[in-house]
């Protein structure tokens, strides 16, 4: 089953909330303050994990461990979280590290772990939807490789799995029934495993999330001040303002109250790379730009809008920006290009550093989304295609004219294959 179909399977029910005695009113005990208390305690915990040698990847993934650790309790039982964990052979007090958070329909991927391991990072990749591998080297996320149950060596009395991705459908239910509550907790504890390993630099650990993993990452950042960097890919905050189907999930009163990542951005201080596409049917570009602007005060923060980038784990892995960005923060690498001044509705002239090429992308009407299939409420896609035009760049100064028919535009600059972008500008003329 391909990535998009898995997304549909996971989230279709989200547009039709379950009506029951608990979903009508947000329970008094489920408040933002309660989340603050729970996650603050979680950050302080010592987290133990157990290796499961039978499921350690081999072949090209040799050296990556399969581990389990406790998640939050669910329905009166303890839970287990599966993860892949790896350390460079020479790991030590200066080794950078990263938590990798998969997207909807995906799982922990040894392929993704290896990519960052080869770049010199210690890595943990938890499965944040409660799935466990059925065979060694599970990573392709096909239906027959993963199970949402504790079987074989994973089975243990008194333990169960955390809820599957519910598309925010249970945001009005008891906290322990909400998938996002468990997913954020799994990321916090994954971070702690790296931090407490004694094999990494405590101040060089970051978090990278793809799609729903980016949503989790955006929320997580408001509860944990330890990350040195973060890279949400596709997903972001401000999803109640989305033009895609995501709006239907995050505009619900209970979801907005508990899970609006932007409500806690005043707590976030680490540099963030918001990496996204200008043609994503799942996450609309306005939400990414709002997220960037809300966190641009954090030194090193960047927005990267990749034109025509498709939505998948594999497409995200192909981009150089995440590792280049991380290296620039924790490894002394060259910084990505930076907008020193931004374009406006009056003029697209702006200044940048470290860029070798500049391009203008614009549309001739306001950005909107529509269904491509009336029978599928998750089939949203943007109605407009961005028009590309070259811009002059000389000594970091970008010049050019705003096309007379441009209604919205942004500028992207590149260097060594990496893209950095301005947020969208609305042409008010």
Predicted regions and their residues:
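N-terminal cap/lid segment of alpha/beta-hydrolase-fold proteins
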Residues: 42-92
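Catalytic histidine neighborhood in serine/cysteine hydrolases
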Residues: 295-313
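The feature captures the conserved acid-bearing segment of alpha/beta-hydrolase catalytic domains
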Residues: 241-295
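Surface beta-strand/loop "capping" patches
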Residues: 317, 324-362, 387-395, 401
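Short beta-strand element of the alpha/beta-hydrolase
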Residues: 82, 93-103
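Cap/lid segment of the alpha/beta-hydrolase catalytic domain
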Residues: 114-184, 236-248
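Primarily recognizes the serine-hydrolase "nucleophile elbow" in alpha/beta-hydrolase
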Residues: 182, 188-253
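C-terminal beta-sandwich/jelly-roll accessory domains of carbohydrate-active enzymes
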Residues: 353-429
């Amino acid at each position: 089953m391909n990535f998009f179909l898995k997304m549909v399977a996971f989230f279709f029910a989200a547009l039709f909330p379950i009506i029951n005695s608990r979903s009508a009113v947000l329970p008094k005990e489920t408040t933002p303050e309660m989340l603050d208390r729970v996650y603050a305690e979680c950050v302080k915990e010592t987290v133990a994990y157990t290796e499961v040698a039978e499921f350690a990847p081999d072949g090209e993934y040799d050296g990556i461990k399969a581990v389990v650790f406790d998640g939050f309790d669910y329905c009166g039982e303890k839970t287990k979280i599966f993860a892949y964990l790896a350390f460079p052979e020479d790991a030590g007090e200066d080794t950078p590290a990263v938590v990798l958070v998969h997207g909807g329909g995906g799982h922990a991927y040894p392929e993704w772990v290896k990519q960052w391991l080869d770049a010199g990072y210690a890595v943990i990749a938890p499965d944040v939807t409660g799935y466990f591998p059925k065979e060694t080297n599970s990573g392709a996320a096909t239906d027959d490789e993963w199970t949402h149950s504790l079987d074989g060596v994973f089975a243990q009395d008194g333990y169960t799995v955390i809820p599957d991705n519910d598309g925010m459908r249970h945001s009005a239910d008891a906290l322990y029934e909400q998938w996002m509550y468990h997913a954020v907790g799994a990321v916090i504890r994954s971070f702690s495993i790296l931090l407490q390993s004694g094999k990494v630099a405590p101040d060089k650990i970051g978090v990278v999330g793809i799609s729903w993993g980016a949503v989790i990452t955006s929320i997580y950042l408001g509860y944990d001040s330890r990350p040195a960097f973060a890279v949400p890919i596709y997903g972001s905050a401000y999803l109640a303002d989305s033009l895609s189907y995501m709006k239907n999930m995050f505009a619900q009163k209970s979801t907005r109250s508990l899970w609006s990542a932007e409500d806690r951005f005043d707590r976030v201080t680490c540099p963030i790379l918001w990496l996204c596409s200008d043609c994503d049917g799942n996450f609309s570009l306005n939400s990414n730009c709002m997220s960037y602007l809300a966190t641009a005060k954090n030194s090193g923060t960047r927005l990267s809008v990749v034109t025509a980038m498709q939505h998948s784990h594999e497409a995200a892995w192909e981009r150089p920006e995440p590792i280049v960005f991380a290296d620039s923060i924790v490894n002394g690498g060259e910084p990505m290009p930076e907008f020193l001044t931004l374009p406006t509705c009056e003029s697209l002239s702006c200044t940048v550093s470290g860029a070798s090429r500049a391009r203008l992308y614009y549309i001739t009407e306001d950005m909107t989304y529509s269904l491509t299939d009336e029978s599928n409420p998750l089939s949203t896609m943007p109605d407009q295609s961005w028009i590309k035009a070259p811009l002059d760049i000389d000594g970091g100064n970008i010049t050019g004219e705003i096309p007379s028919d441009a209604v919205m535009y942004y500028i992207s600059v590149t260097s060594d294959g990496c893209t950095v972008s301005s947020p969208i500008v609305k042409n008010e003329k």
